[in-house]
From Swiss-Prot:
Keywords: Cytoplasm, Phosphoprotein, Repeat, RNA-binding. The gene is cip2. The lineage of its organism: Eukaryota, Fungi, Dikarya, Ascomycota, Taphrinomycotina. Its main location: cytoplasm. Regulates global gene expression after oxidative stress. Interacts and stabilizes mRNAs and may regulate their transition between different cytoplasmic components after oxidative stress. This is RNA-binding post-transcriptional regulator cip2. It comes from Schizosaccharomyces pombe (strain 972 / ATCC 24843) (Fission yeast).
């Protein structure tokens, strides 16, 4: 190795350490380079402001007037020993006359020792914080730290010095972005200057409070909820306009504070004005959030959290009345928009055709409408229940049948009669009457007639040969075209003429989806030869040969008896 390269010059830090302790250059294991002054001049381009620490004689010649020897470093660094308390430092430390031993120094805090850190150590961790216990001590920052801070600031980063709490809890890096106030909104609070804060917080709310705002900013405590406020509702003000609701809601999770079950932004004519409402399950949760979020800084704006105030009784009643009126208007709109069908026969009618009892009443009324005898009325006497009589009256009104209520109390009965004028099958129109039970020729098949082994032509031949159709209207030649006229179509359950004119003819298909209807003569499984079906044109005729005498219909009408009124040609409803 070349001569002069085996010795390395002492760095400024090494010289500072040696000058403040008992070690001397003679006893030091490090040898001094003879050309230290020239090397310092070469390094002056890299560390021009650190040359004053070397105390060379050539610096005095340049007019810096820096005293040489160890007295300069003693005066410069010796005063740090006054900032360390005797309880925290066991040796003389830097600037002291005693011998410093690494073996005697404690690496950590012992059991039962206080977590109050020395003020000088807190200054080293956070030079921006001034010491409250020693007003004469000012925050000092070395030139190297200043150079680092200037470099990081020019690069777009902010150098955040670790606080005492960060050292104890080992929380996160020291360098953050320019929006560090969003992640660490309370970095500057010196929470450990007071003895009352000597303990380490263990809850989220106390952690957020301990990392509070700087001492230069003082916020008043949020008011306690009173009788005019809602204890479980808060109002968050001064929210940044560009901050989304989802991002603000994540702040609750980041701070580990209770999250609201209802959280909404308030928009003024569609524009967000920095106001939000939050509701909580208990007053304790709301109080915790108010204490933590009040003064929380987000992108340079401090939130203001207050309790939500109740409206005056008169104003509250006016708002509630407006809500009820709006709800009533919406219900009326929905009723007008809803189509007329079996599910909603009427807005005030609450019966279900799937109910067996109601379906039985409906079947008897429908068979009464399709009667083949001279029965003029159908009576629902006192043997029926009140609900059945009510349903019978409602169904009769929907079927355009006349009904009347006679008697009082237990003897009350509902009498249903045919209207004075009703249509004739010859003038039948699908626009005015719903073909409830009248299938056309295309939908009538042998399987629906109970004769699965007969095709439609053979069925027509069988009906024509059995003498069922003696009228010229139902001749064998026009059987297929007039096949849908065998039965009288059911009346339509339509609304009044004034309302029906607005809806058009859509109600003609209102009850076309009903399949649970009683059997008719053509749908019985009995042999067709035993039936004697009359023409609907001769319904009012008195000829007894035109009546239905099928076995199934005879079984049905055999159980009918005259009504209590004694009128001839009436029948009474009986339960099956």
């Amino acid at each position: 190795m070349a001569e002069g390269t085996s010795q390395r010059p002492l760095t400024p830090l090494s010289q500072a350490f040696l000058s403040t302790n008992t070690l001397s250059p003679a006893s030091s294991p490090l040898t001094f380079h003879s050309e230290a002054a020239s090397l310092r001049r070469k390094r002056s381009n890299f560390f021009p402001k650190l040359d004053e620490l070397n105390g060379a004689q050539d610096e005095e010649m340049r007019g810096l007037n820096i005293p040489g020897g160890s007295g300069y470093l003693e005066n410069r660094y010796g005063r740090d020993k006054f900032t360390f308390s005797d309880a925290a430092v066991n040796s003389a430390g830097m600037g002291g006359s005693g011998i410093f031993s690494h073996n005697n120094a404690d690496d950590g805090l012992g059991d039962g020792s206080s977590t109050v850190l020395p003020s000088s150590l807190k200054q080293m961790l956070d030079p921006e914080i001034s010491t409250a216990n020693n007003p004469s001590a000012k925050p000092r920052r070395t030139r190297l730290q200043t150079a680092w801070k200037e470099a990081t600031n020019s690069a777009g980063l902010s150098l955040r010095s670790a606080s005492a709490l960060d050292v104890l809890k080992n929380s996160g890096p020291a360098t953050t972005s320019l929006l560090s106030s969003t992640t660490y909104p309370f970095d500057s609070l010196n929470a450990f200057n007071e003895p009352s804060h000597s303990h380490v917080p263990n809850s989220a709310s106390s952690t957020a409070l301990s990392r509070g705002m700087s001492n230069s900013v003082t916020l008043t405590a949020p008011p306690e909820p009173d009788e005019e406020t809602i204890p479980t509702a808060i109002v968050i003000k001064n929210i940044p306009f560009s901050l989304k609701k989802e991002v603000l809601f994540k702040v609750f999770t980041a701070l580990d504070i209770p999250r609201p079950y209802a959280f909404n932004y308030h928009f003024d004519n569609g524009v967000f004005r920095g106001l939000a409402f939050a509701n909580f399950h208990s007053p304790e949760e709301a109080k915790t959030v108010v204490q933590v979020l009040n003064g929380y800084e987000i992108t340079g704006r401090r939130l203001r959290v207050e309790w939500k105030r109740q409206l005056p009784p008169a104003e509250r009643e006016r708002v509630e009345r407006g809500k009820q009126e709006k709800r009533a208007v919406e219900e009326r709109k929905n009723q007008l928009k809803s189509p007329f069908s079996v599910a909603n026969i009427g807005a005030g009618i609450d019966f279900d055709l799937n109910d067996p009892a109601i379906l039985n009443v409906y079947s008897h009324i429908l068979l009464f409408y399709y009667r083949s005898d001279n029965t003029n009325d159908l009576v629902f006497d006192s043997s029926t229940t009140q609900e059945e009589r009510r349903v019978a009256a409602l169904l009769a009104s929907r079927l355009n049948l006349n009904h009347s209520v006679t008697g009082d109390g237990e003897a009350k009965q509902v009498v249903i009669t045919m209207p004075s004028t009703h249509f004739t099958p010859a003038n039948n129109s699908s626009a005015n009457h719903s073909p409830l039970m009248a299938p056309n020729a295309s939908t009538l098949n042998p399987s629906s007639l109970g004769a699965s082994n007969l095709s439609q032509p053979s069925l027509a031949n069988h009906l024509s040969s059995s003498g069922l159709f003696d009228n010229g209207l139902f001749s064998s030649g026009g059987l297929s075209s007039n096949f849908s006229s065998l039965r009288r179509p059911a009346p339509s359950m339509h609304l009044a003429d004034s309302i029906r004119s607005l809806r058009g003819l859509n109600d003609s298909k209102a009850f076309s989806d009903i399949r649970s209807m009683p059997a008719t003569p053509l749908e019985l499984a009995t042999p067709f030869a035993n039936l004697n079906v009359s023409s609907p044109l001769d319904r009012n005729a008195t000829n007894s040969s035109n009546t239905l005498n099928g076995s199934a219909m005879n079984d049905y009408f055999a159980s009918l008896t005259p009504s209590n009124t004694g009128a001839i040609g009436s029948r009474t409803f009986t339960k099956n």
